[in-house]
């Protein structure tokens, strides 16, 4: 039951991600289509212009111009109704009805300063570079989203698509601002004319604005898809690592937590190199050195972590005999050290002490056998031999006797006294 529930959850998540990618793809091509239609059509602006050569007179009126009651002159002609786009203007009324002409952004009768901001705006408006750039970026973003459905392992594709969509939206809104700022409300040649005509924006202009909104929405959606995929990939890699650690440590009983407790290879390498350099600088241990004394050999803590001290069974009888021999004076020792101590305490001879010291040695075994050298045994000798006894002091002379030197001096004195003069 739990597996079925988990499968349903995974299927729901996958469907949700698939829906997001599908919506992003559809939105990308929809925004591209809207922007393409807006660029290629001539319904950005509705206004009146004198380019159509129309008058306010009725079509069948052949009489003189109509004058007001006060004798005023003919009413000024506001021009015919036109619709314009980024490239041309078309007449809807007058003698040139249905005729479209190219928009002249720089009339001959007008002198423009080439360093002015108005001139630069008209140049950008005439080139229409920002709307075209927006359409190109939208097309590239849609292709990247479609490719991300095929190459699902490459998450950077969907991220690049999101960046392209955001850049396309920014380019679109810049183009709209430039279009409004370049005085596109009156494309007629007379700029000095009093601007009393009303104008309105057409559906091409609104298509461009809708393309901007779609570009920003699908850009945010694409970035969100990238974040979710990256998070899922990170969690999947971490779970795979833990599973691999659990399978490797299952035989040893350590589990996946053993991987987390392992030190880094660099730290182990530094410790090992430091211990090897320290061991090479020290002198090689002699067979008479004690393993626990201050002058003993230094072993690397990383190579041999634990030792057990044991007595060689072949030397047990000799050590026991020495211990029993020295038990009268110094008591029985334990192991090899006990035999040597008993021989020394019992007042034994130097040869017996040497035999005890040579017989009482220890064997060190590595508690964790290694694969390369599983049967290696390190042998270190026992305690150093006792120092040689000092020479015996000369015996004191008995009471009432003279030493040889004193007797010789007395003899010389007697000889002097008995010699005749």
Swiss-Prot record:
Bias (Pro residues): 384-397
Bias (Polar residues): 408-421
GO annotation, biological process: positive regulation of synaptic transmission, glutamatergic; postsynaptic neurotransmitter receptor diffusion trapping; regulation of AMPA receptor activity; regulation of postsynaptic membrane neurotransmitter receptor levels; transmission of nerve impulse
Post-translational modification: Palmitoylated. Probably palmitoylated by ZDHHC3 and ZDHHC7.
TM annotation in the entry: 19-39, 127-147, 157-177, 207-227, 318-338
Residue ranges of the region described as Disordered: 271-304, 342-363, 378-421
Residue numbers carrying Phosphoserine: 251, 254
Pfam families registered for this protein in UniProt: PMP22_Claudin
A GO cellular component annotation in the UniProt record: glutamatergic synapse
GO-annotated molecular function: calcium channel regulator activity; channel regulator activity; ionotropic glutamate receptor binding; protein phosphatase 2B binding; voltage-gated calcium channel activity
Function: Regulates the activity of L-type calcium channels that contain CACNA1C as pore-forming subunit. Regulates the trafficking and gating properties of AMPA-selective glutamate receptors (AMPARs). Promotes their targeting to the cell membrane and synapses and modulates their gating properties by slowing their rates of activation, deactivation and desensitization and by mediating their resensitization. Does not show subunit-specific AMPA receptor regulation and regulates all AMPAR subunits. Thought to stabilize the calcium channel in an inactivated (closed) state.
Subunit structure: Interacts with CACNA1C. Identified in a complex with the L-type calcium channel subunits CACNA1C, CACNA2D1 and either CACNB1 or CACNB2. Acts as an auxiliary subunit for AMPA-selective glutamate receptors (AMPARs). Found in a complex with GRIA1, GRIA2, GRIA3, GRIA4, CNIH2, CNIH3, CACNG2, CACNG3, CACNG4, CACNG5 and CACNG7. Interacts with CNIH2. Found in a complex with GRIA1, GRIA2, GRIA3, GRIA4, DLG4 and CNIH2.
Family note: Belongs to the PMP-22/EMP/MP20 family. CACNG subfamily.
Protein name: Voltage-dependent calcium channel gamma-8 subunit
Organism this protein belongs to: Rattus norvegicus (Rat)
């Amino acid at each position: 039951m739990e597996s079925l529930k988990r499968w349903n959850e995974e299927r729901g998540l996958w469907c949700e991600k698939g829906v997001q990618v599908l919506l992003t793809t559809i939105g990308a091509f929809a925004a591209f289509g809207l922007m393409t239609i807006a660029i290629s059509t001539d319904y950005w602006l509705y206004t009146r212009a004198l380019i159509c050569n129309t008058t306010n007179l009725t079509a069948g009126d052949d009489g003189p111009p109509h004058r007001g009651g006060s004798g005023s002159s003919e009413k000024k002609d506001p021009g015919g109704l036109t619709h314009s786009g980024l490239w041309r203007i078309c007449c809807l009324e007058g003698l040139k009805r249905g005729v479209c002409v190219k928009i002249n952004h720089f009339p001959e009768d007008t002198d423009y300063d080439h360093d002015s901001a108005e001139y630069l705006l008209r140049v950008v408006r005439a080139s229409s570079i920002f709307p075209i750039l927006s359409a190109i970026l939208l097309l590239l973003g849609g292709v990247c989203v479609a490719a991300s459905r095929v190459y699902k392992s490459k998450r950077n594709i969907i991220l690049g698509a999101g960046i392209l969509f955001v850049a396309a939206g920014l380019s679109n809104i810049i183009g709209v601002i430039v279009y409004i700022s370049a005085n596109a409300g009156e494309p007629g040649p007379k700029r000095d004319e009093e601007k009393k005509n009303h104008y309105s924006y057409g559906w091409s202009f609104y298509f461009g604005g809708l393309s901007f909104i779609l570009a920003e929405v699908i850009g945010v959606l694409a970035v969100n898809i990238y974040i979710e995929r990256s998070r899922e990939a990170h969690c999947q890699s971490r779970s795979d690592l833990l599973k691999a650690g659990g399978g490797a440590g299952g035989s040893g009983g350590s589990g996946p937590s053993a991987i987390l407790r392992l030190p880094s290879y660099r730290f182990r390498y530094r410790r090992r190199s430091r211990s090897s350099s320290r061991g090479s600088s020290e002198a090689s241990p002699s067979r008479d050195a004690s393993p626990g004394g201050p002058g003993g050999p230094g072993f690397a803590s990383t190579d041999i972590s634990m030792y057990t001290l044991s007595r060689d069974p072949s030397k047990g009888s000799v050590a026991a005999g020495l211990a029993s021999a020295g038990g009268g004076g110094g008591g029985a020792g334990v192991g090899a050290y006990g035999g040597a101590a008993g021989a020394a305490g019992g007042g034994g001879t130097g040869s017996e002490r040497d035999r005890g010291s040579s017989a009482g040695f220890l064997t060190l075994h590595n508690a964790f056998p290694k694969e390369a050298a599983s049967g290696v045994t390190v042998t270190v000798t026992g305690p150093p031999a006792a120092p040689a006894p000092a020479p015996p002091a000369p015996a004191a002379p008995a009471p009432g006797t003279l030493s040889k030197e004193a007797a010789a001096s007395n003899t010389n004195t007697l000889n002097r006294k008995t010699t005749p003069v």
